[in-house]
Amino acid sequence: EITETEKIISSRSWDLIIIQEAPDMLLSKELVNELVQSDIEKIKSLNRNKNCKYMFFNTWIPKVQNYPIKSICLPKSDFDYVKFPVNNLNSDEKFCSEEILNKKEHLRILNEALNQINLKQKMTISNHPNIHFNIGNNYPEIQLYEDEYHPSKIGSFLNACIFYKMITNKNPTRLKFNAGLDEKTASLLKRIANSN
């Protein structure tokens, strides 16, 4: 079955496509190799423009985590019934994540997965998790999250500044738009986005 996203991608010749994957999909090296990589290749194959620039939106670590996070193993059949038909799978075939001891370890695992993707796909990969991690350590008063997973208005503005820099290669500190944020916070976020 063709998804709406696949229909849109194949409907025209795109110059830029930004791909995002759920962070949990990046916690298993095997899952990245067997599913994420092939999903990216499928997206690329649907686009008519062979000179398209592809970016991978490397999302941030969730805000609230109780560490350690135990290794989670899920049957391969839960992920893709076309790629892993249930009747062809041994019931023991699973994707397993690593145990995550702390937030720094979580960041390391995400970055390793993205390096794995980049080695094969040669995509521009955003630096969101490292930027969020550093802001959390250096500016704990800045609330980047609305809830455990989603960005607040401040976090969304930071994300927009990061993408502005990635897509245009222009300095976001020159933008006058502040999204209704106070000047001090907006200026700091623009500087951080520009320096990464």
Predicted regions and their residues:
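Conserved catalytic region of serine esterases and O-acyltransferases that act on ester linkages
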Residues: 142-196
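Alpha-helical cap/lid subdomain in secreted, periplasmic
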Residues: 3-149, 153, 174
